[in-house]
């Protein structure tokens, strides 16, 4: 994405590091729980998240990247808004649930793509990261029957069901797979100059021929 925007290597490195620091800050804050555990431990986690957030801000402020600071601040706002919606279970449609998940997963990259005048990469990141999350949740649901995402899907689709029937579970899986297929099609339709590693990762996630070939080679 940054290569396509003809970005100077030093600027590209700065943008990537800043985004990574901001993502680490968000992930760290997500580890804070309100389960009444060790207060000091929770405070330390909050401070760690604040540290990463401060490092991100200092890195961009020193180089005068005020526009990127503003863009990332908007991304964090969008992410937090969607997290609150999910936490408070204010989502009434599964389509809206998946849209919220897509925003949470990709908002930082989408804002970076917009900042670099490469919105097509933002769309690519949204589809890729949403597909990745859906696949992880689907796998967890199939293997263990436990998935935060599928739990919310069930509450939306079958609000009166205390325990899901096999058919209801299949219905949720079909719905999820339909969205996974949609993300996969969007990725392959993008026609962007992705590098070999990203191509391989997309193929692995989507269950494409490259992933099958790679697995066959590894198994001898």
UniProtKB/Swiss-Prot annotation:
Keywords: Isoprene biosynthesis, Transferase
InterPro entries per the UniProt record, alphabetical: HEPPP_synth_su1
Pfam (any one): HEPPP_synt_1
Keyword Endoplasmic reticulum: no
Protein's UniProt keywords contain Signal: no
Enzyme class: transferase
GO terms of molecular function: heptaprenyl diphosphate synthase activity; transferase activity, transferring alkyl or aryl (other than methyl) groups
Record-level GO BP terms: isoprenoid biosynthetic process; menaquinone biosynthetic process
Tree of life domain: Bacteria
Catalysed reactions listed for this entry: 4 isopentenyl diphosphate + (2E,6E)-farnesyl diphosphate = all-trans-heptaprenyl diphosphate + 4 diphosphate
Enzyme Commission number(s) of this protein: 2.5.1.30
Function: Supplies heptaprenyl diphosphate, the precursor for the side chain of the isoprenoid quinone menaquinone-7 (MQ-7).
Assembly: Heterodimer of component I and II.
Designated name of the protein: Heptaprenyl diphosphate synthase component 1
Organism lineage: Bacteria, Bacillati, Bacillota, Bacilli, Bacillales
């Amino acid at each position: 994405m940054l290569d396509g925007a003809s970005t100077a290597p030093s600027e590209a490195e700065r943008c990537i590091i800043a985004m990574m620091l901001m993502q680490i800050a968000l992930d760290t804050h997500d580890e804070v729980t309100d389960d009444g555990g060790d207060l000091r431990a929770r405070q330390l986690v909050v401070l760690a998240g604040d540290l990463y957030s401060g490092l991100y801000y200092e890195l961009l402020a020193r180089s005068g990247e005020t526009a990127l600071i503003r863009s990332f601040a908007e991304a964090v706002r969008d992410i937090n808004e969607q997290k609150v919606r999910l936490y408070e279970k204010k989502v009434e449609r599964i389509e809206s649930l998946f849209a919220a998940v897509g925003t949470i997963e990709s908002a930082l990259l989408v804002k970076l793509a917009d900042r670099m005048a490469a919105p097509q990469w933002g769309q690519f990141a949204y589809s890729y990261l949403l597909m990745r999350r859906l696949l992880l949740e689907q796998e967890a649901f199939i293997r263990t029957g436990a998935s935060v995402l599928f739990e919310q899907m069930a509450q939306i689709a079958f609000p009166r069901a205390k325990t899901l029937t096999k058919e209801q579970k299949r219905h949720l899986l079909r719905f999820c797979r339909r969205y996974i297929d949609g993300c996969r099609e969007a990725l392959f339709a993008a026609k962007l100059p992705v590098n070999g590693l990203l191509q391989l990762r997309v193929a692995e996630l989507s269950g494409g021929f490259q992933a099958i070939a790679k697995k066959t080679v590894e198994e001898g």
